[in-house]
Amino acid sequence: MINTNTLARPYAKAAFEFASAAQQADAWLNMLSLSAAAVQTPAVAQQLVNPALTDEQKVNVLAQICAGHIDASFSNFLRSLGSNDRLSLLPVVREQFAVLKAEAERALDVEVESAFELNAEQLQTLAAALSKRLDRTVQPKPVVNPALIGGVVIRAGDLVIDGSVRGKLNKLAEALKS
């Protein structure tokens, strides 16, 4: 079976290139978010797999749901997806579009896992330090995990910084076993 990421990638890339050239990346991300949410609702998902409907009818169903929130160029994009029976890929296309947009803006979502809830000042200080280290704009996403005991674990893309007490105890245990 073909990976949905592989199928969605060219659509996301084409959409991002078009939206960037038209300086409409934010608007396209909003339209992709709306249409992706629509295709994930059970009623719409059922219509998209209905063999009695043509590809054009499926696109029209989605376009009617999103009417007033999508423009003509996005409607054409939906028709392109529909003609290739790829409307169900919209959530993955949206996800990949968001990644491309973040890369272009040099922005990065960073998961900050801590034992206790961090206040706004702590998150801001952490974001500033990470922005300097990673040379990107950082958007911290706080996650509370009491199992860490103390400290934080930071996940930024492929980078993981484990400054938790649990992580240090695990390293100490490994050193003692050696």
From Swiss-Prot:
Entry-linked Gene3D superfamilies: N-terminal domain of the delta subunit of the F1F0-ATP synthase
Compartments, record wording: Cell inner membrane
What UniProt keywords are attached to this protein's entry? ATP synthesis, Cell inner membrane, Cell membrane, CF(1), Hydrogen ion transport, Ion transport, Membrane, Transport
Q: Which InterPro entries match?
A: ATP_synth_OSCP/delta_N_sf, ATPase_OSCP/dsu
Q: Which residues form a coiled coil?
A: none
* Pfam families per record: OSCP
From the UniProt record, which GO molecular function terms apply?
A: proton-transporting ATP synthase activity, rotational mechanism
Top-rank taxon, per record: Bacteria
List cellular component terms (GO): plasma membrane; proton-transporting ATP synthase complex
In the bilayer, the protein is annotated as: Peripheral membrane protein
Q: Which PANTHER family match?
A: ATP SYNTHASE DELTA CHAIN (PTHR11910)
Role description? F(1)F(0) ATP synthase produces ATP from ADP in the presence of a proton or sodium gradient. F-type ATPases consist of two structural domains, F(1) containing the extramembraneous catalytic core and F(0) containing the membrane proton channel, linked together by a central stalk and a peripheral stalk. During catalysis, ATP synthesis in the catalytic domain of F(1) is coupled via a rotary mechanism of the central stalk subunits to proton translocation.
Q: How does it assemble?
A: F-type ATPases have 2 components, F(1) - the catalytic core - and F(0) - the membrane proton channel. F(1) has five subunits: alpha(3), beta(3), gamma(1), delta(1), epsilon(1). F(0) has three main subunits: a(1), b(2) and c(10-14). The alpha and beta chains form an alternating ring which encloses part of the gamma chain. F(1) is attached to F(0) by a central stalk formed by the gamma and epsilon chains, while a peripheral stalk is formed by the delta and b chains.
Family designation: Belongs to the ATPase delta chain family.
Official protein name in the record: ATP synthase subunit delta
Q: Which organism is it from?
A: Ectopseudomonas mendocina (strain ymp) (Pseudomonas mendocina)
At the highest ranks, the source species' classification is: Bacteria, Pseudomonadati, Pseudomonadota, Gammaproteobacteria, Pseudomonadales
